[in-house]
Amino acid sequence: MFSLLRKAIDVNRSRITLHGIKVHSINTFRLIPYSLSLTKQIRFYASEGTDAGEMEKGLSVVNANHENRPFRDLEGYHFNTFTFLKTLMDKGYTEKEAEGLLEVTNMFVTDMLRHSHLNYLSEADFENCSYLFRTALSELRSEKINMRKDQISSLRSGLFSNQREVESLEQLVHEQLNKLNTESKMEFENRKNDTKNEVQQLSARIVELHNLLAVSLGKLRAENERQKWDQIRKAAGVVMAFTGFLVLVIPFGLGVRSRKKEKQDELDNLGSFNLDNKRDDYTDTNLSHM
């Protein structure tokens, strides 16, 4: 098993030696079963001829020129197995124990590198991501600038079109106002002339009515005077007739009254004589009875 593993490890893969690994006395008999169980797992021995498709899915290979980055990708990992094995054998380990430690160390390092590769971001990935982010940001900025320029140009064209429309509308409004002003002036003049003609006609009619009224008043006044004189003449005739009647009736009435008075006087005298005779007869009768 160890010989096969050793043959599988080529010298070309071990160009870079792992520094800073302290070798302690390890019970190899405890580590050998663990190393044998790890041999069943997938090994990540990276070499110059390793294809990227053989690596685990989800891992991105970034070939960078930086030698002192903290985490290298699995494809750039090189383990100097010969120097490591020679160092262990110089420390007193046998060849099998050294090969077991080599295998276990290789497994631990590979697992740690895979864990770091899955959980941490390498400097190259970070640089690529930052570069992609800066590129996307610059593209977004340029697109935003272009969009803003397009918007500004569209706004300017819309503003110019609006200005032209406003100017045309202003010109149309001025034309309509001038037309309305002219029409209103003409209408006002026509109305003024019509009103003047109507006033003249009304004045002529008023004068005509005044003349007719004056003539009618003259006729009415003459008729009134005529009727007044007729009434005066009628009243004078009535007064004269009444006066003549009085002149004729008063003497006749006075004569009738004088005659009535004379008759009354005679009747009075006759009555007083009869009363005296009755009084004398009464006194005679009374005396006879007594």
Swiss-Prot record:
The chain crosses the membrane at residues 236-256. One of its GO terms (cellular component) is mitochondrial inner membrane. GO terms for biological process: regulation of proline metabolic process. Residues 161-216 form a coiled coil. InterPro entries: CCDC90-like (IPR024461). It is a single-pass membrane protein. It is found in: Mitochondrion membrane. It comes from the Eukaryota. Keywords: Coiled coil, Membrane, Mitochondrion, Transmembrane, Transmembrane helix. This is Uncharacterized protein C27B12.07. It comes from Schizosaccharomyces pombe (strain 972 / ATCC 24843).
